[in-house]
Structure formats: C-alpha cells, structure tokens
Amino acid sequence: MRRPVVMGNWKLNGSKTMVAELLTGLNAELEGVEGVDVAVAPPALYIDLAERLIAEGGNKIILGAQNTDINNSGAFTGDMSPAMLKDFGATHIIIGHSERREYHNESDEFVAKKFAFLKENGLKPVFCIGETEAQNEAGETEAVCARQINAVIDAYGVEALNGAIIAYEPIWAIGTGKAATAEDAQRIHASIRAMIAAKDAAVAEQVIIQYGGSVKPENAEAYFAQPDIDGALVGGASLDAKSFAAIAKAAAKMKA
C-alpha cells in the first residue's frame, strides 16, 4: 500500500509572522492525524524558521523546498544546493514545476539533472510534470507526461524513480480555479503508472503520483478515492492551516 503524501507549495508567499502562524496552526490541526505524510515547501528564506517551528510542534510535518541547483557549492550566484537543504532538514524538494519551466526556461533535460543530483544527495525529488491547456485540448497529455518522465528514465534508468514522487499538475489548472475531474485525473495517473510499468512493474507499483491543480477541501476526497492518486501537491489552499489540514485528513481517510 502506497502511503499518501500531501505537500504544500507556498510559492512566493510568506513573512515571518505568516510562517509562524501557519505552522503553529498546522501543528495543532494535524494533532492525532495518521496515515498520511504532510510536507511543506516554504520560500528559501523561511526554511530555517520553518525547521524550528516544525521541531517545536513535534515534527509532524516534513520540511521541503521549492528548488535546488545541480551543484553543491561554487560560483553559482543566487542558487541553493542539496547540501544546504539537508543542513536545514529539508528532504522533499520540488523540481520541474511549470513555473520554473516557463519563467526560468528549465528544460526536461535540466530537470532530469536536478532529479539525479537530489537522489545522489539522499533527498526525495517531487518531480512535477503536466501539460498546457493547448496540449490538453490537442489530446497530447499522455505524450507530454511521458516525454517529461522519459527525460529521467532515458538518462538514469527507470530505477531512478524508486523513492521519488511524481506530481501531475495540468498547467491549465494551477491557480486558475479550474481543475481536472477526479476521473480525468485518475485516467492520466493510470497512464503514467502504466508507462512506467511497461519498463518496470515493481517501480511503477511503489511510485507516489500526486495530483496538483486547484485541490481544495471540497474536492480532495473525490481525488483521493481514485486508486492511482496517491496524494496532492497543493498551492493556494496550503496557505491556510485549516484548509490544508482538511486536505491531509481527506487523504488519510480515503487511503486508510
């Protein structure tokens, strides 16, 4: 049985006050909740504060980050390395998010290098994939997802996916209020798992595949009722302790 993972991507949001209030509230909301891994990815400047607040709350929350470099040190202004992230206890690292791919011109191949470097450093990639609205309307969703995943498989082998998390995020559903139906999301998740299974069934069976794209407390149970949806990568709703905890509780309930 795959253990669900619900992760909050805070993106470029936060202040010291907000981080303290959010994590304190989340620690309280998650009291007694079992059967789900709950992670947060604050902006880099707040990872230190988040680490301390998570520890004060009894380490019920996993600390993550929103990006990494493909070097551990050197003349790379503005970047942060896996070694630095580990130093602050961050383990679940988002890579390949559509906003990074679009605004920072990150290619499939570059994202694959990040994936491999995280694994090499003992960290867990949260590997984002997904299609644009135009690609969706053209019926290219499965092909786009396969291309993005194959950038890792072709370079490092299907076994590289062991212990990783794949986050399917249809780009047209991120921050728009639109969302794929639970049935449509399940169809894509099943196709992703089948594509991996064609290369290695054991790897496909254990890999966590999250859904992301306007996941809210109101629709979370419908997603988690699907057999191939193993959690969620949550944006806006993760900035509210009650809403984010409700999504985590839905995962624990539906995957029990």
Curated annotation (Swiss-Prot):
Keyword list, A-Z: Cytoplasm, Gluconeogenesis, Glycolysis, Isomerase
Entries under Gene3D superfamilies matching the protein: Aldolase class I (3.20.20.70)
Reaction(s) catalysed by this chain's protein: D-glyceraldehyde 3-phosphate = dihydroxyacetone phosphate
First-tier enzyme category under EC: isomerase
Record's keyword annotation contains Isomerase: yes
Cross-referenced InterPro entries: Aldolase_TIM (IPR013785), TIM_sf (IPR035990), TrioseP_Isoase_bac/euk (IPR022896), Triosephosphate_isomerase (IPR000652), Triosephosphate_isomerase_AS (IPR020861)
EC number: 5.3.1.1
Pathway: Carbohydrate biosynthesis; gluconeogenesis; Carbohydrate degradation; glycolysis; D-glyceraldehyde 3-phosphate from glycerone phosphate: step 1/1
Pfam families on file: TIM (PF00121)
GO molecular function, one term: triose-phosphate isomerase activity
GO cellular component: cytosol
Gene Ontology biological-process annotations: gluconeogenesis; glyceraldehyde-3-phosphate biosynthetic process; glycerol catabolic process; glycolytic process
Entry keyword annotation includes Nucleus: no
Active site, per annotation: H97 (electrophile), E169 (proton acceptor)
Chief subcellular location: cytoplasm
Origin superkingdom: Bacteria
PANTHER family, per the entry: TRIOSEPHOSPHATE ISOMERASE
Protein name, UniProt field: Triosephosphate isomerase
Annotated source species: Vibrio vulnificus (strain YJ016)
